[in-house]
Structure formats: C-alpha cells, structure tokens
C-alpha cells in the first residue's frame, strides 16, 4: 500500500459541497488541505445523483443547477493548491501518540494534524437492478448515475423507478431523447404530485404496473422484456439506454468503528464542530447537535466554524475569529 508521508494541517473526508467549501476555507486560513473522496468525482450527491436539478435554498442564488454549484465551489477552492484524492474510501482512523492522525484508505495511508469529516449521510450506493447479466451492461448503456443529459440526445431511453428521481429524469429527458419510457411496478408514482401531473401531460410513455424481467442484448441492452405485476401481459421495449432509479442505500460503514460518539447515524459535535476526539471535527449532514437542521446552507456555515477551530487547535496563538475575506484577498 502506498504511503503519503506528508503531514497535512487539515484532511477533509468527503468531497461534497460542504467538503469543497471546507477545503476553500482551510486555504483562507493558510492551512495545507487534502480532500479524500470515495467517488470518482467531486461534488458528492449533487454530482452523482442530480447534477441537472435546480437548488433553490442557497443564499444569493434564486436558483442554481446542482452541477453549476459544484463547479463554482471547485473554482472557489482552486484559489489554493489543495490535494485531491479520488476513489479512496477511508477505512480506519487512528490518533497516534504524537497527536497526528493516521488515515488508512483502500489505496493509501495519509497523515494529518486535524480531520474534518463532511461525508453527508455516509457512503451511498444505488440499489441495483437484480436481473441476469445486468451487471455486465453497467459499463455500456445501463446507468445508475447521470452526469450529462445530452448523452441521451436522439436516443430511446427507458427509466426504471417510481420516485421523484425517476419522474424528474423522465421529464428532463423528454425534450432531449428521441423517446422516453418510464416503467414502474405500481399504478401510482411516489413522486411529488405536480411532477406526476406533468408526467401524465407529457409525451413520456408511462408503463405501469410492469416490471423488467429480462435484458436482451450482447455488448449493450437492445431490448427489455416487461411483465405485468398482476396479470399475464408481456411486452418488449426497444431501447438505446436504461436508467435505473430504485433509490440509494447510505451507511456510515467503518466510521462507526473510529471511536466517535454516534447518535442516530450522525456524529455528535460541540458548538466548535469538534467531536469527542480532540482535533477531529465534523460539518454538514453527517453531524448533529441540538437544533441541527440538515441543509446545504447549514453546512456552509458549519464549515468555517470547524476550520477556524481546527486552526486554533493546531496553533493556540492563532485567532479563532478570522479576518474578513475582502482583507485577505486584497492583501494577496
């Protein structure tokens, strides 16, 4: 296993929106920062699950696309030379006798003076389509994540699922794809009423109550066999792409073994955002305290609190209260 012997000031576990802002703010406090992210890209759930959806509750933006928000956060962070480690899941964390944290991932060993975990609801994985050969099509035209809607331009797309994500993707694909079908095992969808109304008023082919029973194709899925849930009807759908929206399963996983105080699947923090382990902080949806509200906006406020207190932990002479950003950047 590789080892990065450099000891960073702050290691951020989780590269979602709160993690990105944490890394930026660490740079503002002149700390060396490393981000460790388990996914292949930064942005967390915003990039992985709904990059094309709009967010309406971020201060200063009447609305902003999820991926655009991530891109802005990355641009903001890029003012500083932060180290990014992708596709690495932290498995163990140990505070050594010298006070330095040793973090072991599935690929590498890292060292840090402090840790700020911003891992959202923990690691998340999509619920898979459980059909023979489904896994073999994941690298071609069976999708659990969508990064660019335009890749489906002029194509026949089948969306599997009945929740908000499935309905939203079907509606967003309608003006782009050649043909969109949504397949759900029940007659009624579990999505927002307004979205369901829009779906039924759209040109999307609604197929209910049917389930996929077979995927036909060699290198790519060419057809899906659909069978009625309570009945004998069967139909075959020609497709170019299949998008699966059966939801996601999130778990704290190994985080529970790190000696942190956990309450209802969240890490308990003080008003400084410090956990029960000195030098180990948490921000965003993964942490909890009295009156906690799980919003991106809340996480953006918790990140500077964690960074400023981490700075004071590393250097007791440092001010917890920082200078205003205008002063910092004008002096550069």
From Swiss-Prot:
Its EC number is 1.18.1.2. Pfam families: Pyr_redox_2. The keyword Disulfide bond does not apply. It catalyses: 2 reduced [2Fe-2S]-[ferredoxin] + NADP(+) + H(+) = 2 oxidized [2Fe-2S]-[ferredoxin] + NADPH. Gene3D superfamilies: FAD/NAD(P)-binding domain. Signal peptide: none annotated. FAD binds at residues 37, 45, 50, 90, 124, 285, 326. Binds 1 FAD per subunit. GO terms for molecular function: ferredoxin-NADP+ reductase activity; flavin adenine dinucleotide binding; NADP binding. Keywords: FAD, Flavoprotein, NADP, Oxidoreductase. Its cofactor is FAD. PANTHER family: THIOREDOXIN REDUCTASE 1-RELATED-RELATED. Belongs to the ferredoxin--NADP reductase type 2 family. Homodimer. This is Ferredoxin--NADP reductase 2. It comes from Bacillus pumilus (strain SAFR-032).
């Amino acid at each position: 296993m590789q080892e990065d012997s450099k000891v960073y000031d702050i290691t951020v576990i989780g590269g979602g929106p709160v993690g990105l802002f944490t890394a930026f703010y660490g740079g503002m406090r002149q700390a060396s920062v490393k981000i460790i992210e388990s996914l292949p890209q930064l942005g967390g759930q915003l990039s992985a699950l709904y990059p094309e959806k709009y967010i309406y509750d971020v201060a200063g933006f009447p609305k902003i696309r999820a991926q655009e928000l991530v891109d802005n956060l990355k641009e903001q962070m890029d003012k500083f030379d932060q180290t990014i480690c992708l596709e690495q899941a932290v498995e163990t964390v140990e505070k050594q006798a010298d006070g330095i944290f040793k973090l072991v991932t599935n690929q590498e060993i890292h060292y840090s003076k402090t840790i700020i975990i911003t891992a959202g609801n923990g690691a998340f994985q999509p619920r898979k389509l459980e059909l023979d050969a489904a896994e073999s099509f994941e690298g071609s035209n069976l999708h659990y994540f969508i990064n660019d809607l335009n890749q489906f331009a002029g194509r026949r797309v089948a969306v599997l699922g009945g929740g908000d994500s499935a309905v939203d993707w079907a509606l967003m694909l309608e003006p782009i794809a050649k043909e969109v079908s949504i397949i759900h095992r029940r007659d009624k969808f579990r999505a927002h009423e307004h979205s369901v109304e829009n779906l039924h008023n759209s040109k999307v082919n609604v197929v209910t109550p049917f389930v996929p029973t077979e995927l036909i194709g060699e290198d790519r899925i060419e057809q899906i066999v659909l069978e009625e849930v309570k009945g004998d009807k069967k139909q075959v759908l020609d497709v170019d792409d299949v998008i699966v929206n059966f939801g996601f399963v999130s778990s704290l996983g190994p985080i529970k073994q790190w000696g942190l105080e956990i309450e209802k699947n969240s890490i308990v923090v003080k008003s400084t955002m410090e956990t029960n382990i000195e030098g180990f902080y948490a921000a965003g949806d993964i942490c909890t305290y009295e009156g906690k509200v799980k919003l991106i906006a809340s996480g953006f406020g918790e990140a500077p609190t964690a960074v400023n207190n981490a700075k004071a932990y590393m250097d007791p002479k440092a001010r917890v209260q920082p200078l205003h950003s205008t002063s910092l950047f004008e002096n550069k």
